[in-house]
Amino acid sequence: MTLLAPRWLTLSALLALGATTSIGCAPPTDEEAGEEGSSTDDITQIDHTKVKRQSIGNCWIYASASWVEALNKRSTGVEANVSESYWTYWHWFEQLANGRSMTEISTGGSYGTIAGLIDRYGLMLEADFVAAESEAEMSNRQSAALAAINESLKTGALKDPAVRRNRAKVRAELDKAWGLDRTVVGRLDAVFGTGVTKTLDRSYVRNRPNNSIIRARDFDAAIYDFTTNTVKKVKLQDALGTGSYWSRSGPLAFQEVNYPSSAAARRKFQIAVQKSLHASVPVIISWKVDFNALSQSSQFSKEELDRRGPGRQGGHMTVMDDYQVKLSDGRVLKAGEPATADLLTRALDTRATVEFFRVKNSWGAIRPDRWSDAAKPGYHDLLMSYLNGPIKECVERDGHSDPTNCPGSVTPWWDAVLPAGLGNDIGF
């Protein structure tokens, strides 16, 4: 399979899934254990951090943060709360300072976008960026800041192109919109300069920036080396690799790979994902949401969608956690239940059929307005009949999909970010 360019999750294509009144990453309106004495293992053992809830359309940042936190937790045993707001701040800065935002900020992005942001600006913990939200499930600061910046673009300081060309003034507007206190602003100034004359990839190659700003090369992570079949404690930079938005390189670098079209290639792709999950390595997945496919049991079902017809649509990014599979003899290995090593091996047979993948989402843990009976709070089951599609694709009007105008069709599963060593049979 040819490796295609990563899919860009645009503002108009994304659904703001975290809140009930915003638009963004798809808009929010509001079997058994083995024989006695045999060793068992969960189908997956990814030690995820707590579920969060996005308030704007930056699901790709939340998915990436979950991925980073899981890699770090496996290495340290500690649950870090990485600041999604910090990366959102710099995403907006680059749009404004580079002339890409004239009337409204785009909240959309991709894995390639976040990798580049981490290269240049590293990461911060939420307690060090927006301390008031260090324990919050949802960031109200993000939605307030978005409204403030968009208003500034329309009627305020950022309406003036000369201001947008002044990087120090752009940062000042962002600092004000985000309500950053003087200590945090001082940290950013000390590391990057008031006009962002320094970035981590250029000015801090040898020295740590300190001031609570962490380079990827200093942030602990643990991955699974599929060439040696061992867990390795590394740094986040090893998992990210180096390179541009379009391509990341490095012996341990994860790669964004498009979901193939043929049944045989798709099964190889699924097996690569299964192997990653067996090794407790989180996998980011990009997929198309149609809310009419969401059942009260928190499943995305083609059957449900066919019954109800098309609804609101958009792009989404989440992190995989588990899966359910029917073996070639008809036995079902259920998500969340233990299985012997032999059964896990049989789950990788090309004749085995994955029934669904379970993903950690960024829509909050308890959402009676969206679902009432989740197998795992904050997680969703993406049935393969839905992911394989095809489903109707509706035309967008004013940033919203029109369920009455759906002339085309699409495969909902777009791509996945896979660890090094798993893609030889599927394209990289």
Describe the residue ranges of each PLM region.
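Active-site-adjacent substructure of cysteine-protease-like catalytic cores
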Residues: 158-161, 258-358
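Conserved catalytic-core surface of thiol
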Residues: 335-428
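Mixed-charge, low-complexity intrinsically disordered regions
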Residues: 231-260, 304-308
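Processing junctions and N-termini across compartments
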Residues: 18-19, 53
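Bacterial N-terminal signal peptides that target proteins for export
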Residues: 1-12
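N-terminal Sec signal peptide cleavage junction
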Residues: 23-25
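Active-site nucleophile-adjacent alpha helix/oxyanion-hole segment immediately C-terminal to the catalytic cysteine
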Residues: 37-238, 243, 271-279, 283, ...
